[in-house]
Design a protein with these regions (language model features):
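Alpha/beta-hydrolase-fold enzymes
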Residues: 133, 138-233
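Catalytic active-site module of serine/aspartate enzymes centered on a nucleophile-bearing elbow/loop
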Residues: 290-322
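N-terminal cap/lid segment of alpha/beta-hydrolase-fold proteins
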Residues: 11-60, 305
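Active-site nucleophile elbow and catalytic-triad environment of alpha/beta-hydrolase enzymes
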Residues: 227-250
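Short amphipathic alpha-helix adjacent to the substrate-entry channel of hydrolases
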Residues: 80-98
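Catalytic nucleophile-loop/oxyanion-hole region of alpha/beta-hydrolase
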Residues: 86-88, 102-138, 304
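Short beta-strand element of the alpha/beta-hydrolase
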Residues: 63-72
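Short beta-strand/loop motif that positions the catalytic acidic residue
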Residues: 254, 260-262
């Protein structure tokens, strides 16, 4: 485990400011090129949003690296972390893509299966699509997408398609993360922000009258996972889902370079990975502050907020994996 020099000014150290403020700071719009593919079940369309670099094809594959971002719950290519990473990737001259999970990115789900935090088969399917056109693939996952990517790296081992991975603000122990989200601010602020959109999607899907009644009564993510996520994805209960989908038990099996970045004050997380939980191929980067996918600093010289802490470390890690 290594500590870093991330040291925001005192007025930016609050974890909730770090978590909430980025949404309002990132103003840049990006002109993505969208392609639709079928999911791993061949049921629903999923959207891949690309930003392409100048490159040439050799034997049908682009030669510059592709950075793949797996988004968080209800995230998209327009999420603040996607846009800040995209800018850094463009500066490096690499390709960039956000493959959206089922029902995300404005593309409605067609089948009964949505997305969940442990669906590594879906990640493998997405990366397989991309590997057909790109020689070198680096992957980054944030929050829910970070847990899925970390689990993928351990579960697939040498068969993981990406060369290396960066995992940010990931709830690698889903049960304790669910408890953390039930704390006062989580229940009052974060839960409604995440829960309401996904319940609306579920209500628009193929559901029974009993499911409709239960979903309308859901008050927290645990309720939603028990009513919808677990049964839809073949789990007995939310606890069974959390146990099987959590990345933590798989971290010792990782054989490709993986960087896990976590803030100690992340309000979304419970149990986090320690050195004894991971393989020798995993680097743990832990900061005192940063909140959940925040890591905002401030430059007094330019009087501007700085959002590049995570993107710069991710790119440096990727380039070091070559």
């Amino acid at each position: 485990m290594m500590n870093t020099t991330f040291a925001p000014p005192f007025w930016l150290k609050n974890p909730h400011i770090q978590t909430i403020l980025p949404k309002f700071l990132v103003k840049d719009t990006l002109d993505y090129e969208r392609h639709l593919y079928k999911d791993s079940l061949d049921e629903s369309d999923v959207a891949f949003d690309y930003l392409l670099a100048d490159d040439v094809l050799v034997d049908g594959k682009y030669q510059k690296p592709l950075v793949v971002l797996f988004h968080g719950m209800e995230g998209s290519s327009q999420s603040h972390y996607a846009r800040t990473l995209a800018k850094q990737v463009q500066t490096a001259g690499f390709h960039f893509v956000v493959p959206h999970f089922r029902s995300c990115g404005g593309v409605a789900v067609s089948g009964k299966i949505f997305y969940n935090a442990g669906d590594t088969a879906e990640l493998h399917h997405y990366l397989g699509i991309l590997k057909q056109q790109y020689q070198t693939i680096y992957a980054m996952g944030v929050s829910l997408g970070g847990n899925a990517l970390a689990k993928y790296m351990g579960e697939y081992g040498t068969d993981a398609i990406c060369e290396c991975a960066v995992v940010v603000s990931a709830p690698v122990d889903l049960a304790s993360a669910s408890i953390a989200m039930d704390r006062l601010l989580g229940k009052k602020i974060y839960t409604p922000y995440l829960l309401n959109p996904i319940i609306k999607k579920a209500l628009d899907n193929q559901i029974t009258a009993d499911e409709i009644t239960a979903l309308k009564r859901a008050k927290c993510m645990g309720d939603f996972d028990n009513i919808f996520t677990a049964p839809r994805h073949g789990f007995v209960s939310k606890n069974d889902y959390y146990r099987q989908a959590s990345a933590l038990p798989y971290l010792k099996e990782i054989v490709k370079p993986t960087l896990i970045i976590t803030a100690k004050d992340d309000p979304f997380l419970g149990v986090t990975a320690e050195r004894g939980d991971v393989s020798s191929q995993v680097v743990l980067l832990t900061t005192e502050h940063g909140g959940h996918i925040g890591f905002i600093d401030y430059d007094y010289a330019t009087r501007a907020f700085c959002m590049d802490y995570i993107p710069k470390r991710a790119l440096a890690f990727f380039e070091g994996c070559v």
